[in-house]
Curated annotation (Swiss-Prot):
The name this protein goes by in its record: DNA-directed RNA polymerase subunit beta'
Cofactor: Mg(2+); Zn(2+)
GO biological process, alphabetically ordered: DNA-templated transcription
UniProtKB keywords: DNA-directed RNA polymerase, Magnesium, Metal-binding, Nucleotidyltransferase, Transcription, Transferase, Zinc
InterPro entries: DNA-dir_RpoC_beta_prime, DNA-dir_RpoC_beta_prime_bact, RNA_pol_asu, RNA_pol_N, RNA_pol_Rpb1_1, RNA_pol_Rpb1_3, RNA_pol_Rpb1_3_sf, RNA_pol_Rpb1_4
Species of origin: Lactobacillus gasseri (strain ATCC 33323 / DSM 20243 / BCRC 14619 / CIP 102991 / JCM 1131 / KCTC 3163 / NCIMB 11718 / NCTC 13722 / AM63)
Listed PANTHER family: DNA-DIRECTED RNA POLYMERASE, DNA-DIRECTED RNA POLYMERASE SUBUNIT BETA
Molecular function GO labels: DNA binding; DNA-directed RNA polymerase activity; magnesium ion binding; zinc ion binding
Enzyme Commission (EC) number: 2.7.7.6
Binding site for Zn(2+) 1: C60, C62, C75, C78
Coiled coil: none
GO CC, alphabetical: DNA-directed RNA polymerase complex
Length: 1223
């Protein structure tokens, strides 16, 4: 076998007939498969052992030679080589065809490759290949033309007239002869000459022909190889035949398709031997052609060949295509051993880096390790006994299992794996039962809950895998989300509820105003029942000397609650004391107002003081982020476990419950509803009198009821009691919100109708009163719509993620610094008056490209080439700076990836990104994972004239990434200048906007309905909107440049996501947008050998031009183009990656004609061939590192060798020995 980790690249090409014969181990002459009685393969058949190798290991077919000692011998009786049966997976056969047959990919694809080479229309070609017309091969001295088509009647007539002075044939042999006649060099030269003058359709056709002919010229493929004289037969174990229980056989469809080819081929041979009439032979040749077409791509032409039950047979092309094809099913999605799956369950006792593995599961997964250990400890005499011991589940195996799983992390994965946190490593802990136990804080990253979710478990085997799992994948390291750098490990539900209740304050609780010397003293008072968690107490600051206190108050007494004191004890000792749930308190000591002034009475102070706020979910998340920033992984992990423990304990002991009495009632609900009904009656009257349209009536009714619900909601908010358990749940962020509360205590309001609108009849009851039957029925529509929307959204979002991953999978951090001098100027993104993304968010984690100066003092706040952390970003924003030039992925010069400086910080760690990080995949996951949170709806304007329908949510994101023409497209100016006039044209129902530029004046016709975004006298720049709506990126790149287009895509994607409350860092969107603008289209090739109209990588384009300029030639010119992500993924340099994405046959057809070479730079292509991916520890930089052992001098003398030393010694000893024997 070839070692996949050794080769650099992989090439694809057309196979010549001789190449096919050289692969083959013999010709398949008969359509038989296996003998129905003996079940042995038939001689010369599709499973022949003489051709494909023995069916049993180390044994010939007749049994004369058995055993590995006869390896390589060919049996003289049955002719079968004695070898491993594995060869039946790699040995090919072939079928010698009685007549040439065209390959359907090259004649039927779009564009038809054969048609372009011969300059014949695909329809004419089809007539020739399928024996409907003759084609003139050599016109001789007659009045016929070369490649002219003749019908049967015309052919006879010309034959009678000219005899043998011309030659015309039909079928694939005619095409083959024509292809052999093509002089590629001459054709290429002629076409290049033609291009100098040609225009329009002629030029387009010439460019397409030149492209194909040039591909043949450069690749060394011969055009005549598109027609086959013999076809390969794939190894039999790849098209197996298996016996089913009832003695029947199940076989791969390929065997049926091969049998048809062989049958027709043999019949044709026989007819040719018999000198059968021409018409019969032609018919048989046509049938052979169709049989080969069906084998290669069934259904591409005409009706597909069907098997039993009218099911189309799966041909070779279908074996590669689609989700169930070879690429996606077996190469990119292999099943692995040492894995299991089970239902998950919560275990609050685990540490953050642990998971519970059921005993029987652990025993099965770690079986080889346990067996090894049993033998090593002498508890079993050999492996077989050890296995028996495990199967019997003897008592002594459990201790060994405990020892074996120590220090061996396992990976847990939950499908769908939407981002890289969907697979994390944990240390296994043996638990009883059959369910996998998960830590409650790990749920957020997995999006797991315990209503029956299942998870898969995997065991890393090699030492390297174990080390990577522990160092890179351990759950305790994954505290920040890669998409925005905020903690993903957020406490929820009980933990939030417990900590909120713990930190609440109450007036007049027992022991209020007691002053304690130390936390221990307060704990005793609590244990004795003298104070409560909610009691406000005084505490001496010097009892916690490690903590930072305000200057001058280090020995003072400050006011807190006992609950907050307990909460603070889980923080690091030298962290600030947290008394207020504010960002200020996380970074500064306690506010001075909490301290008692000398001689001040604590009771008086408490009476005048507002109650401190309790700590909600958001604040807990902020404190996790702050601790991570200050103390890094280990301490944060401990803090999270303490937070969890405290939350659960307090929540359990607090006695928080819900009963129906906790749902308050409001007295005047009926009056509010009656008032709304009156208003609705008024509106209906207006409609009946014809004063308003039906649409207006509907909108007004909806608005009245929404208003009514808001009034009820506000009343409920007013009667919120801070001690009410439901209020506590909603306010703390543990579960529910005010809207749920309104439905319980107020009214449900309007329901969604099945058509997507709103029903005019509201549900006026609430859940406490109970709904009427009609109201219940109306509610079901909304519920169903919610479910269907979610299901559709998941599919759409998943497909978007797949396309994003595919287009960016080869973007890897490849170097430290690309040395670019360009940068991206960023400012806050706004929409009207609304802030979409503040400048601060755009600066954190990025390098400055130029120094940042204070706008007033002009001092340098931040020099160039510095990574901005949060403190620096705050400093810049607080100084009043509105725009900063940063290093950006857009302007990075690195080929096939990005450099560290242009990318900036790795948001998941808060440190510099490392070389080898697969930032493309991370970006795709970060954009795709929140896709399900976006809405599916296109918001319509409710009939308000002027505003175009705007697309939002997921459809808008897809529209941008696919670079489609947007809905509600804005007209943009193509010149920089002034708006001289805006005139209406009533006849045409349009407005005319005139822009006067420096050199020319442009007039734009816009429809009446469009809202004009400019006024007369306004100054506009190229690419500015003249009407409201979305800009078409393809137009923008034509009018402006690539960078402007990239900036537009970035800001629009951010708008789509942030409107829905989803935060994604800019850099992820930048990586995607850059991939869409990687190509240029050649306008004029200059003196390069590039073809006009060709798409090529910017990097390659620059390299080609550099060569020409150095040699003093004229460089090529090109224009930037924007490709949608699907198109960009298919245009990648790797044919393996493109073929495994979509349109497999088209990609492979094109790649083989061009003789493409896949440089294996991305992740997918390496996964496909089974090579280690070139990212992370798979980067060449890391793979070439050698571990260096530092040994003190005196130790060295004690003959401690590294393996390398031993190998050197052995080699030297061998050399000595050889030398001695030579002498």
């Amino acid at each position: 076998m070839i070692d996949v980790n050794k080769f650099e690249s992989m090439q694809i090409g057309l196979a010549s007939p001789n190449k096919i014969r050289s692969w083959s181990y013999g010709e398949v002459k008969k359509p038989e498969t296996i003998n129905y009685r003996t079940l042995k393969p038939e001689k010369d058949g599709l499973f022949d052992e003489r051709i494909f190798g023995p069916t049993k290991d180390w044994s010939c077919a007749c049994g004369k030679y058995k055993g590995i000692r006869y390896r390589g011998i060919v049996c003289d009786r049955c002719g079968v080589e004695v070898t491993s049966a594995k060869v039946r997976r790699e040995r090919m056969g072939h079928i010698e065809l009685a007549a040439p047959v065209s390959h359907i990919w090259y004649f039927k694809g779009i564009p038809s490759r054969m048609g372009l080479v011969l300059d014949i229309s695909p329809r004419a070609l089809e007539e020739v290949i399928y024996f409907a017309a003759y084609i003139v091969i050599d016109a001789g001295d007659t009045d016929l033309e070369d490649k002219q088509l003749l019908t049967e009647a015309e052919y006879r007539e010309k034959k009678a007239k000219f005899g043998n002075r011309f030659e015309a044939k039909m079928g694939a042999e005619a095409v083959k002869e024509l292809l052999e006649q093509v002089d590629i060099d001459k054709e290429v030269h002629d076409l290049k000459e033609e291009l100098k003058t040609a225009t329009g359709q002629k030029r387009t056709r010439a460019i397409r022909r030149l492209d194909i002919l040039d591909a043949f010229k450069n690749s060394g493929n011969k055009p005549s190889w598109m027609v086959m004289d013999c076809i390969p037969v794939i190894p039999p174990d790849l098209r197996p035949m298996v016996q089913l229980d009832g003695g029947r056989f199940a076989t791969s469809d390929l065997n049926d398709l091969y049998r048809r080819v062989i049958n027709r081929n043999n019949r044709l041979k026989r007819l040719l031997d018999l000198n059968a009439p021409r018409i019969i032979v032609q018919n048989e040749k046509r049938m052979l052609q169709e049989a080969v077409d069906a084998l290669i791509d069934n259904g591409r032409r005409g009706r597909p060949v069907v098997g039993p039950g009218n099911r189309p047979l799966k041909s070779l092309s279908h074996m590669l295509k689609g989700k169930q094809g070879r690429f996606r099913q077996n190469l990119l999605g292999k099943r692995v051993d040492y894995s299991g799956r089970s239902v998950i369950d919560v275990s609050p006792k685990l540490k953050f880096y642990q998971c519970g593995v059921p005993r029987p599961m652990a025993l099965e997964l770690f079986k080889p390790f346990v067996m090894h250990e049993l033998v090593k400890r002498g508890l079993a005499s050999n492996i077989k006994n050890a296995k028996r011991k495990i199967d019997r589940e003897d008592d002594d195996i459990w201790d060994i299992l405990e020892d074996v799983i120590k220090e061996r992390p396992v990976l847990l994965n939950r499908a769908p794996t939407l981002h890289r946190l969907g697979i994390q490593a944990f240390e296994p802990v043996l638990v009883p039962g059959k369910s996998i136990r998960l830590h409650p804080l790990a749920c957020e990253a997995y999006n797991a809950d315990f209503d029956g979710d299942q998870m898969a478990i995997h065991v890393p085997l090699s030492d390297e895998a174990v080390a990577e799992s522990r160092l890179l994948m351990l759950a305790a390291h994954h505290i920040l989300a890669p998409k925005d750098g905020k903690p993903i490990v957020t406490p929820s539900q009980d933990i939030v509820l417990g900590n909120y209740w713990l930190t609440q304050a109450e007036r007049g609780r027992e022991g209020e105003g007691m002053i304690f010397d130390s936390p221990a003293e307060a704990a005793i008072a609590y244990a004795n029942g003298d104070i409560h968690y909610h009691t406000r107490i005084g505490l001496a600051a010097d009892s916690m000397p490690e903590k930072p206190w305000p200057k001058g108050y280090e020995h003072g007494i400050f006011v807190t609650t006992y609950g907050k004191l307990v909460f603070n004890q889980i923080f690091p000792k030298d962290f600030f004391y947290i008394n207020d749930p504010t960002q200020e308190n996380l970074t500064h000591p306690v506010d001075e107002r909490y301290f008692l002034q000398p001689g001040e009475d604590i009771h008086e102070k408490l009476d005048n003081m507002k109650l401190g706020k309790a700590f909600k979910k958001g604040f807990l998340s902020d404190s996790i982020a702050q601790i991570y920033k200050d103390y890094k992984v280990q301490r944060t992990s401990d803090f999270l476990d303490d937070l969890k423990e405290l939350g659960y304990t307090v929540c359990t002991t607090s006695g928080l419950t819900i009963g129906v009495e906790d749902i308050p009632t409001i007295t005047d609900k009926d009056d509010i509803v009656a008032e709304a009904r009156k208003k609705v009656d008024v509106v209906s009257k207006q409609y009946r009198r014809g004063l308003i349209t039906d649409e207006e009536r509907h909108d007004r009714v909806i608005s009245i009821w929404n208003n009514c619900k808001d009034i009820v909601q506000n009343e409920i908010a007013q009667i919120h009691a801070p001690r009410n358990p439901i209020t506590i749940m909603a306010d703390s962020g543990a579960r529910g919100n005010i809207s749920n509360f309104t439905q319980l205590a107020g009214m449900r309001g309007l329901m969604a109708a099945p058509n997507g609108g709103m029903m005019e009849i509201p549900v006026t009851s609430n859940f406490r009163e109970g709904l009427s039957v009609l109201e219940m029925f109306m509610s079901t529509h909304g519920a169903r719509k919610g479910m269907t929307d979610t299901a559709l959204k998941t599919a759409n979002s998943g497909y978007l993620t797949r396309r994003l991953v595919d287009v960016a999978q080869d973007v890897i951090i490849r170097e430290e610094d690309c040395g670019t001098d360009r940068g991206l100027t960023v400012h806050a993104i706004t929409e009207g008056d609304e802030m979409i993304e503040p400048l601060f968010d755009r600066l954190v984690g990025r390098y400055t490209s130029k120094s940042v100066y204070d706008p007033e003092t002009h001092e340098v706040i931040c020099p160039a080439d510095v990574l901005m952390d949060e403190d620096m970003a705050h400093k810049i924003v607080d100084a009043g700076v509105t725009e900063v030039t940063i290093r950006s992925v857009f302007t990075c010069n690195t080929q096939h990836g990005v450099c560290k400086k242009c990318y900036g910080m790795n948001l998941a760690t808060g440190d510099d990104v490392e070389v080898g990080e697969a930032v493309g995949t991370v970006a795709a996951q970060s954009i795709g994972e929140p896709g399900t949170q976006l809405t599916m709806r296109n918001f319509h304007n409710g009939g308000v004239a002027g505003a175009a329908d705007i697309t939002q949510g997921l459809p808008r994101v897809q529209e941008l990434f696919e670079a489609r023409n947007p809905k509600g497209r804005a007209t943009i100016s193509e010149v920089t200048g002034e708006i001289t006039s805006i005139e209406e044209d009533p006849a045409e129902h349009t407005r005319q906007i005139t822009v006067k530029g420096q050199t020319d004046t442009r007039t734009y016709d816009v429809p009446y309905t469009a809202s004009v975004a400019v006024a007369e006298g306004d100054h506009v720049v190229r690419g500015d909107k003249l009407t409201l709506g979305s800009i078409d990126p393809k137009e923008l790149i034509r009018v402006r440049d690539a960078l402007t287009t990239e900036k537009y895509i970035l800001s629009e994607i951010q708008k789509a996501y942030r409107m829905q409350g989803v935060e994604i860092a800019d850099k992820h969107v930048e990586v995607m947008a850059r991939q869409m603008l990687q190509k240029v289209r050649i306008l004029d090739p200059g003196e390069t050998d590039i073809l006009p109209g060709e798409l090529m990588d910017i990097g390659e384009f620059k390299a080609r031009n550099r060569e020409v300029i150095i040699s003093g030639g004229i460089p090529a010119t090109a224009q930037s183009v924007i490709l949608g992500i699907t198109k960009a993924a298919l245009e990648t340099n790797s044919f393996l990656s493109a073929a495994s994405f979509q349109e497999t046959t088209r990609v492979l057809t094109d790649a083989s004609i061009r003789g493409k070479n896949d440089p294996l730079l991305g992740l997918k292509e390496n996964v496909i061939i089974g090579k280690i991916i070139p990212a992370g520890t798979g980067m060449p930089v890391y793979r070439e590192m050698e571990p260096k052992v530092d040994v003190p001098e005196d130790e060295k003398k004690k003959s401690v060798y590294s393996i390398a030393d031993i190998e050197k010694k052995l080699a030297a000893a061998d050399a000595e020995k050889d030398k001695g024997s030579a002498d």
